[in-house]
Amino acid sequence: MDLELMINSFPKLLNAAVITLKLLSVSLIIGLFIGLFFAILRLNKNIFINRFAYGYSYVFRGTPLLVQIFIIYFGLGQIEYLRSTVLWVILKEPYWCAIIAFALNTGAYTSEILRSAFQTIKPGIIEAGKSLGISNKVIFYKIQIPIAIRQSLPAYGNEIILMMKGTSLASTITIMDLTGVAKYIISTTFKPIEVFIVAGGIYLFMTFIIHNVIKFLEKKYSFN
């Protein structure tokens, strides 16, 4: 075991972890809005709107994240029309292609998490709001959404951790995130065990932080 290599690799891998966290945070923010939008569509009684939202969720939850990244990065770039549009400014960059793939993927899972949370809200809470003369719009934004978010925290916390680990796939399209830098160091030192132990330790630490933040939020916003 080369301890010197592990010590020397740590600062480089720690800096790369910043890229991983950027990928994760931007993807989660965009994915949360996408998830909320499609969760609302899934609750719509219109069968066409409902099926459309279900189709999106089914496709992105039913296919590997790696395939989605490759289709967006390699596949869309082969469409001649897209190369002549403003979209090409974004699609030609590996970073933004990864963000799009991650956001769409986590958005699909988030939509199902939020949909389930909305459905667990007791009708009596909504009826109580209506009896006080509160409009449906205010009830939805001020009562239903906050309750749904609180209800979904445990499941969404797991999704954040899964997404954090999923960002390692960004290295497959040349992004030098934590896994990407680890691969580069391994290619020059030929010592994968030491490098991946350090990288794995950093991933584990980030998981520990995320887990405890979610746990804190659960307690803080507990209905009890």
PLM features: residue spans?
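Transmembrane alpha-helices and adjacent helix-loop boundaries
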Residues: 1-224
